[in-house]
Amino acid sequence: MEWDSGSDLSADDASSLADDEEGGLFPGGGPIPYPVGNLLHTAPCGFVVTDAVEPDQPIIYVNTVFEMVTGYRAEEVLGGNCRFLQCRGPFAKRRHPLVDSMVVSEIRKCIDEGIEFQGELLNFRKDGSPLMNRLRLTPIYGDDDTITHIIGIQFFIETDIDLGPVLGSSTKEKSIDGIYSALAAGERNVSRGMCGLFQLSDEVVSMKILSRLTPRDVASVSSVCRRLYVLTKNEDLWRRVCQNAWGSETTRVLETVPGAKRLGWGRLARELTTLEAAAWRKLSVGGSVEPSRCNFSACAVGNRVVLFGGEGVNMQPMNDTFVLDLNSDYPEWQHVKVSSPPPGRWGHTLTCVNGSNLVVFGGCGQQGLLNDVFVLNLDAKPPTWREISGLAPPLPRSWHSSCTLDGTKLIVSGGCADSGVLLSDTFLLDLSIEKPVWREIPAAWTPPSRLGHTLSVYGGRKILMFGGLAKSGPLKFRSSDVFTMDLSEEEPCWRCVTGSGMPGAGNPGGVAPPPRLDHVAVNLPGGRILIFGGSVAGLHSASQLYLLDPTEDKPTWRILNIPGRPPRFAWGHGTCVVGGTRAIVLGGQTGEEWMLSELHELSLASYLT
């Protein structure tokens, strides 16, 4: 994240800020919660900010003085913990034995208890030379009295300790005195360093600078000074930030969710970024879906859950449509009378395109596997299914995966063909044109054939494939592999992000989900993917949630511990995402898909619970 330091304030400006009783940086007014006086030494101070919300409290900002004194550039240390300064040089893996462990323990204690720390600790420059760090750590509290950031002010002092040469070091950094003398007078004065930014109008700062930052960065920038704090309280700015970071379609969907306006864009951005308000709850709804069935497909249209088809008694394919309106005070399943329904089927996909249009593809019918396409406008009067006769269709299949691109294009991948043959192809159908034509997406290399996997869209035109029942030679096995493809490229190709010995596969940090199929994949704002449920072997819990951000340089799996009552079972074909902020899991606690009067809801924002 990018921060702008307040450490260039002149003495008069700093005193004015510290004495202003109307507040400035933080809610409720009052003095600035970190010692401005410490920034006014004759010699400049290092200034470091860490994110107390994230695991291991990563560094999110260092000022120029820190870089010049320690020899570490900002890009080398951002995202890491400050403890690297206790190691002698960039190649050292352990804390140096001369570093006082009692002081380190006291620092940890103060951070854990949320209190300020003051003391001295031996640190090392990048070249391995020692210096004493007169350190002051101050916790910063958010609106809900939780610690959001920790500010560290560092006054570095030369120390005469002969430690000998540093292994792997080929150069010697300048001494601290030389660095201080090299600093121009203007660089020591914060107000001069920031005047270029503050000469801009509020409109330019908000619309041309702040709106282009990520939600995390905007939250960080708000702590720089009073003016930026006030600017970042504007709801229109936060909406623009969310739109730029998450896309217009996601923003539009979020606007339709009940309660979003009451929560506000600033709070919504925070909760959907940190997932701090995510919670499970169990719901009971009225109505019924008769006859009972399994292996149906569910999809969300706005705040409505739509269920189509399924496998009835004696493997009877179904072709009826049911709707559950979650906007209702008392939601209940209602049978929708539609004209010209498709042939009955199960193992198909049901996908939403163009707002209120539903697309059915494939599945297993009375006469075998299908590769037909039907579209239903749920808001039409009366609703009528119509068949789309796309040219050059894919092979008939079931238990494939599908997703939508740009709101108009259907993408179909894999599945099971005749005689149990697993497929590895990927097709695209543009439903916005009058006579759609199926187009296979060619790739020099494709992931192993599979069924029961998921496709997720992120970053505009990128798709991510996860899991499924994959084929390797004569063997079929549950998979936890991750593959991505960028469809904006001239020649799209599959890339293996993580995998079990796949070509070019990486080894992600964290704990990867156990291999599975027919699981749930939830697209989160910003490109992150949430995985849970499905068919998992062994004693692993299917209700455990796993988070992956494929946009990171080194994607890392993270386990999420969400409060509430999660379902013991969740199936991909029976789960849908409503409004971009709620995952609705159909079926009872014991996994019986036909118990559709019981739902489990994963809410990602507090206004939904």
Curated annotation (Swiss-Prot):
Q: What else is known?
A: 'Zeitlupe' means slow motion in German.
Q: Which organism is it from?
A: Arabidopsis thaliana (Mouse-ear cress)
Q: Where in this protein does the record say S-4a-FMN cysteine is found?
A: C82
**Keywords, comma-separated and alphabetical:** Biological rhythms, Chromophore, Cytoplasm, Flavoprotein, Flowering, FMN, Kelch repeat, Nucleus, Photoreceptor protein, Receptor, Repeat, Sensory transduction, Ubl conjugation, Ubl conjugation pathway
F-box domain: which residues? 195-241
Q: Main role? A: Component of an E3 ubiquitin ligase complex that plays a central role in blue light-dependent circadian cycles. Acts as a blue light photoreceptor, due to the presence of FMN, that mediates light-regulated protein degradation of critical clock components by targeting them to the proteasome complex. The SCF(ADO1) E3 ubiquitin ligase complex is involved in the regulation of circadian clock-dependent processes including the transition to flowering time, hypocotyl elongation, cotyledons and leaf movement rhythms.
In a knockout, what does one observe? Accumulation of ADO3 protein during the morning period and early flowering time.
Outline the segment boundaries, as ranges, of region: Disordered.
1-24
Q: Pathway of this protein?
A: Protein modification; protein ubiquitination
Q: Which family does it belong to?
A: Belongs to the ADAGIO family.
Q: GO biological process: any one?
A: protein ubiquitination
Taxonomic lineage is: Eukaryota, Viridiplantae, Streptophyta, Embryophyta, Tracheophyta
Q: Which residue range or ranges hold the PAS domain?
A: 32-114
| Record note on what altering G119D does | In ztl-21; long-period phenotype, decreased interaction with SKP1A/ASK1 and loss of binding to GI, NFXL2 and APRR1/TOC1, but no effect on binding to PHYB
Q: Enumerate the Gene3D superfamilies for this protein.
A: 1.20.1280.50, Kelch-type beta propeller, PAS domain
Its recorded name reads Adagio protein 1
Q: What terms describe the molecular function in GO for this protein?
A: photoreceptor activity
Choose one Gene Ontology CC annotation of this protein and give it.
cytoplasm
Q: Where are the Kelch repeats?
A: 292-342, 345-392, 397-445, 450-501, 516-564
Tissue expression, as annotated, is: Ubiquitously expressed with higher levels in cotyledons and leaves.
Q: Low complexity: which segments have biased composition?
A: 1-17
Q: Respond yes or no to whether keyword Cytoplasm is given for this record.
A: yes
